[in-house]
Amino acid sequence: MSPQAIEVRGARVHNLKDIDIDIPLGKLVGIAGVSGSGKSSLALGVLYAEGSRRYLEALSTYTRRRLTQAEHAQVDEVLHVPAALALHQRPSVPGVRSTFGTMTELNNSLRLLFSRCAHHVCPHCGARVEPSLNVAAGLSLTCPVCGREFYAPGAEDLAFNSGGACPTCGGTGVMREVDEASLVPDESKTINEGAVLPWGTLMWDLMKQVAGEMGVRTDVPFNQLMPQERDIVFHGPAVKKHILYVPKNGEGATPLDFTYYNAVYTVENALAKVKDDKGLKRVARFLREGPCRDCGGTRLSEAARQPQVRGINLAQAAAMTLGDAVEWVHGVPASLPPEMRPMAADICDSFLSAARRLVDLGLDYLSLDRAGATLSTGERQRVQLARVVRNRSTGVLYVLDEPSIGLHPANVDGLVGVMRDLVDDGNTVVVVDHDTRVLAEADYLVEMGPVAGAGGGNVIAAGTVDEVEQSQGSRIAPFLRADPKRMRPQVTDEEMFDQGHIRMATDAIHTVKPLEVDIPRGRLVAVTGVSGSGKTTLVLETLIPALKAQAAGERVPSHVRWVDAEGIARANLIDATPIGANVRSTVATYADIHDELRRAFARTPEAKAAGYKAGAFSYNTGALRCPTCDGTGSISLDVQFLPDVEIICPACRGSRYADTASHIHREGKDGSKLTLPQLMDMSVDEALDATVGLKKVQARLLTLHDLGLGYLTLGEPTPALSGGEAQRLKLASEMGRVQDDAVFVFDEPTIGLHPLDVQVLLNVFDGLVAKGATVIVIEHDLDLIRNADYVIDMGPGGGDAGGQVVCAGTPADIAACSKSITGRYL
């Protein structure tokens, strides 16, 4: 009899408590639990780690050397685990040459279509040649006008990453040009006062004197210069001028011959010398990116834009949204001569089968030429998922980490359909998620908990969804079976705008139509809508830049007609990007707790006797850091023929400190004595009890506790935090301040949050609102939307079918709006 389940015995990865669990094979298995309860540790740290490692071990040593390999999971035994693939919560951001079409491989089918089935252009006389099977057969075409023969371009000749690239932009579709408006942002200043910014930041300051020798008055406001003087500043010739250079200390003048660099050339010269991101950042403020003037942003050469199918070229086809492209491709075979239709149908079927799942996952609003780097995390994850389904593999374990991220409730059925397809093909799907609509579709449900961190790591419920719903110990059960309720009191229509308005009017940008919005100040405002409806464009690309510009007295973005937000001095985006670049950044250092602890330990008698000051207690640079791992807590071993092995430092056992640090104790109010390494190994909640008497530390720890982060250890590296944890940690410094001049914007703050964690998040928002802040969230989570004071629903659809404010008002108003797709689910 074949195995029926993956048998996990004695799993101890991260906070897992030596657990035993059987995961049914060939089923859709959901894993639930509060944040930090051990869900990902079980799914990714045990199931995926062991499934992928064992598959790779079956390969040759030569092959394994070229692959990234995982270390053995901390588990006694895992039996019957299939080869595993993981779809992570944060797929990598693709490079500048990647588009939605290349990521999904839809461009491959399109290029083949335009190579084999197009009306090609004769390179000799420019006449169009009817579609012919000669192209597929590798034969030449004969021009009906001039009679000369030529070969049609192959699929590779139509690729913007290969032979079809525009020679001007190299296939990127964009050109960087100097933005003259940014060179002199304040024309009320004189040149001597620094009106021409590049001369003070990218070029020697004495260029002001050279400009004076060029005939430009440098002691009058820039806006009073004559047109010819302005032209010299921006475009003057590179000629040598004799100047007297006086150093800042005023001692002695030195005669110099100096070549004049006009303001535009100063930037162009600096750009040409850029060697890294830091250098580009200095120059970027003076640049604007625009479409390539030769290819118009299509990335394709003129020759690659010549072939036509159904009256359009490849660039025009790629500019379509996926939904429009599907409709267009359906009509291609019928537009061709009868003998070509079978071949065209095969190519079109390949395109349509790949597109079907992308449409099911709600990505039909994306254009094929959309730059891959501009896709959201959820969009990239769904592209990844659709690609996996198309492979039609069998006998594989797929581990999906929160695939519902960024997914509107209207698209959940499509996601479940994709996962069911994988199971129907004979695979096992393990999905870590918090969305109760996704979990309710599982054949088998495992719940981890009961709480986060050290208090979690246990299986508190397992079985079918019905069995988990009846389980007394389950924390997800009430949300699987209960009707949703509103937690926060509803603000009445009469009170909604009591604290003021934020008003804004915009012109069209991307798919967002010209619109006006009115946002109540001092309220929790949710911006909703299906994927691609314009939420991100409205809030992140329009509202935040406009508020920041107005607060700084600068020009608002060109597509913003006007903004009225009197009294708003700060616009803060709290996003889910990881905090810190390496393991040296920890929860304690980011929250300014570690500095206070170092000072406290430096005041102890033992530290004073040894001559240790606060700096000695730094694990990054201090004298007490571990010399073996240099304060990182881990070391990397280079093992030949095997991957580098990252292990806990054997000298400090992960504490980051040398043994000397364990001899310096601080006495608590209860008489207990603790070392700094011991404190750093504690959770926030444990440290609250251990640091009584340290007022600043207590206040900061209490803030983290109130943010729902009490389970995090002080020494936990910040890059390892989930998106939701990172967002809340970034808020730590803002809590407790008066915020009536502030707007806080959260981009999908419920990412990675259990329904119970969403309640904690709502309490955090209440704390900000109580201090006068205006809190704006871009969100799909129905529990959060239901608890907002005010909702702005974008749509009605995605892409060209969206970009409008469908309705705005209380959640009840949205639910009653017949045009709102979000309202149907509320």
Task: Locate predicted features.
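Conserved phosphate-binding elements of NTP-dependent enzyme cores
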Residues: 1-826
